[in-house]
Design a protein with these regions (language model features):
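Conserved glycine-rich acetyl-CoA-binding loop
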Residues: 80, 94-95, 108-119, 131, ...
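A contiguous, mid-protein "functional segment" used to position or interact
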Residues: 152-184
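Conserved acetyl-CoA-binding loop-helix of GNAT-fold acetyltransferases
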Residues: 102, 107, 113-126, 138
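Short amphipathic alpha-helix that is part of the acyltransferase structural core
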Residues: 3-7, 12-59, 65-81, 95, ...
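Conserved active-site alpha-helix within GNAT-family acetyltransferase domains
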Residues: 130-134, 139-165
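Conserved beta-strand in the GNAT
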Residues: 71-73, 80-91, 98-106
């Protein structure tokens, strides 16, 4: 199943769920803006708890901006942020190829069975493919992410820069065979955050 199949399948599933009245709230997915940052951070705190910044994935995100055009939020009818996902540029080991690291993916914990997480995933994968990226990696639960094509099959020789459970390092090839032979520890890449300048003392 290729990326377009994921999108079509996901749209069909959402249509069926909507006809059954299973979707609890309407939402749209848009590009994240600077104004969304406080709401996004508050949502992540609620959904993932205070230890989220200690995860090994955070070492690859710290001090970096998301990959260009790959930061999204879900909004409800009032415009409030109800979900978030971002993707980050990484390098596969020393002198390795480039890829994306997806995460964190989070949905407002008060909203259940609305399809927000799945919609964010499918949108993110489709945009990553459209922008020409070759592979997406993440650390997460295989039973959930397998539905989007992720598996640990191609990550056996790859590692995160910190403690993690190896079986939870998953990958999706957007270009077939691009992860063949990939090995080493993932390294942060992409755009760095600009350091804030402190005002000079009088």
């Amino acid at each position: 199943m290729d990326v377009l199949d994921f999108i079509v399948e996901g749209a069909a599933q959402r249509s069926i769920s909507a006809s059954r009245g299973e979707i609890a709230s309407a939402f749209v997915i848009t590009a994240e803006t600077a104004a969304d940052v406080p709401a996004r951070e508050a949502l992540l705190d609620r959904a993932m708890g205070p230890k989220r910044r200690k995860k090994s994935s955070e070492k690859l995100r710290r001090g970096r901006r998301p990959s260009e055009g790959l930061a999204f939020v879900a909004r409800d009818a009032s415009g409030a942020v109800t979900g978030t996902v971002r993707l980050w540029d990484v390098v596969l080991g020393e002198g390795g190829g480039s890829a994306l690291l997806l995460g964190p993916l989070a949905v407002d914990p008060t909203i259940k069975n609305a399809g927000i997480g799945s919609a964010l995933m499918r949108h993110a994968i489709a945009e990553a493919a459209r922008l020409g990226h070759a592979a997406v990696l993440l650390v997460g639960d295989a039973p959930y992410y397998e539905r989007f094509g992720f598996s640990a099959e191609k990550t056996g020789s790859l590692a995160m820069p910190g403690p993690y459970e190896r079986h939870r390092l998953l990958a999706l090839e957007l270009v077939g065979g691009v992860l063949a032979g990939a090995q080493g520890t993932l390294k942060a890449a992409g755009r760095k955050l600009k350091a804030q300048r402190l005002p000079l003392a009088a």
